[in-house]
């Protein structure tokens, strides 16, 4: 009797572990790291919007942004399953590893996309729902199915997909758009190239093996280093636009200036990294890795500075 109970308990624990593993696989399909940044920038746009904020509408809107980001990520993983399988960085993703079927992933992504847009429409307004739908389409179709495999400017143009959340958040609570959410869009848009090109420098062989025309693969490492610095300088200028438009005060100006100085220093470090004649790093791309990590902190801290300035200084 006790033996049967022990066996039954073991089976129950095994089933629970299996369910937990499957849940983690589906969660991984949503690209949770991307979601975290997308949701944060969307919430920042919502919080910066003028007028009273309905807590329920705000919560549902952020949930919709989260769902939409995950849906686009799932469709991206479905379409990229062939190249994910040959890249070291992505080979263990759920679809190429055989843990989730590709048709399941596509159905999940489409269903989640429709649900997120309809819920945003019902809870917030048509403008927010339209921008949300367009952002899903832009990432899943324009970027994933067209730009990513056809041009080294894939990240530059495709970066618009990840830049929409501040506009969505703002529109969800106001039903309109203003200058500030457009500037926030521009900041994220210009942040995307140096962020991803830093990654592509030290993952260049992976991208080349998969046939993805990332800038270092097509134009070489040296050209990419100059482009990282170029876009970082433009980003630094645009990040100060809220101050010049009197949409932010001295606190944000100080935070942005310090963060910009750090980002430019990282970009200069990438440019002056010890290289061979082809521009390939002789240091294991340590400066590029440092720039990639810094870029993540940069965007988070920049928007934190904008929020802190809004609630502590500008009000």
UniProtKB/Swiss-Prot annotation:
Record keywords: Cell inner membrane, Cell membrane, Heme biosynthesis, Membrane, Transferase, Transmembrane, Transmembrane helix
One of the protein's GO biological processes: heme O biosynthetic process
Pathway(s) of this molecule: Porphyrin-containing compound metabolism; heme O biosynthesis; heme O from protoheme: step 1/1
GO molecular function, one term: protoheme IX farnesyltransferase activity
TM spans (from-to): 34-54, 55-75, 105-125, 127-147, 155-175, 177-197, 226-246, 251-271, 294-314
Membrane topology: Multi-pass membrane protein
EC category: transferase
Catalysed transformations (reactions): heme b + (2E,6E)-farnesyl diphosphate + H2O = Fe(II)-heme o + diphosphate
EC number of the protein: 2.5.1.141
A Pfam entry, by short name: UbiA
An example Gene Ontology CC term for this record: plasma membrane
Subcellular location: Cell inner membrane
Principal localisation: membrane
NCBIfam families reported in the protein's UniProt record: cyoE_ctaB (TIGR01473), PRK04375.1-2 (NF003349)
Other information: Carbon 2 of the heme B porphyrin ring is defined according to the Fischer nomenclature.
Family: Belongs to the UbiA prenyltransferase family. Protoheme IX farnesyltransferase subfamily.
Described purpose of this protein according to its UniProt entry: Converts heme B (protoheme IX) to heme O by substitution of the vinyl group on carbon 2 of heme B porphyrin ring with a hydroxyethyl farnesyl side group.
Protein name: Protoheme IX farnesyltransferase
Originating organism: Gluconacetobacter diazotrophicus (strain ATCC 49037 / DSM 5601 / CCUG 37298 / CIP 103539 / LMG 7603 / PAl5)
Biological classification of the source: Bacteria, Pseudomonadati, Pseudomonadota, Alphaproteobacteria, Acetobacterales
């Amino acid at each position: 009797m006790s033996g049967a109970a022990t066996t039954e308990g073991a089976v129950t624990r095994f089933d629970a572990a299996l369910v937990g593993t499957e849940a983690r696989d589906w969660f991984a399909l949503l690209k949770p790291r991307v979601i975290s940044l997308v949701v944060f920038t969307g919430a920042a746009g919502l919080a910066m919007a003028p007028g009273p904020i309905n807590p329920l509408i705000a919560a549902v809107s952020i949930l919709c942004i989260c769902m939409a980001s995950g849906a686009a990520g799932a469709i991206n993983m479905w379409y990229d399953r062939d190249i994910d399988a040959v890249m070291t960085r992505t080979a263990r993703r759920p679809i190429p590893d055989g843990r989730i079927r590709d048709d399941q992933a596509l159905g999940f992504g489409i269903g989640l996309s429709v649900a997120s847009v309809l819920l945003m429409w019902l809870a917030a307004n048509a403008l927010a729902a339209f921008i949300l739908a367009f952002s899903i389409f832009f990432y899943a179709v324009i970027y994933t199915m067209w730009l990513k495999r056809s041009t080294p400017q894939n990240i530059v143009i495709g970066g618009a997909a990840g830049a929409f959340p501040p506009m969505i958040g703002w529109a969800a609570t106001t039903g309109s758009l203003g200058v500030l959410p457009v500037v926030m869009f521009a900041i994220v848009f210009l942040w995307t190239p140096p962020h991803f090109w830093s990654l592509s420098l030290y993952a260049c062989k992976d991208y080349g093996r998969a046939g993805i025309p990332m800038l270092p693969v097509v134009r070489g490492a040296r050209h990419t280093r100059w482009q990282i610095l170029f876009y970082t300088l433009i980003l630094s200028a645009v990040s100060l636009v809220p101050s010049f438009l009197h949409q932010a005060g001295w606190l944000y100006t100080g935070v942005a200036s310090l963060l910009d100085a750090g980002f430019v220093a990282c970009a200069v470090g990438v440019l002056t990294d010890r290289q061979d004649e082809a521009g390939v790093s002789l240091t294991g791309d340590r400066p590029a890795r440092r720039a990639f990590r810094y870029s993540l902190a940069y965007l988070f801290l920049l928007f934190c500075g904008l929020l802190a300035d809004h609630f502590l200084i500008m009000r």
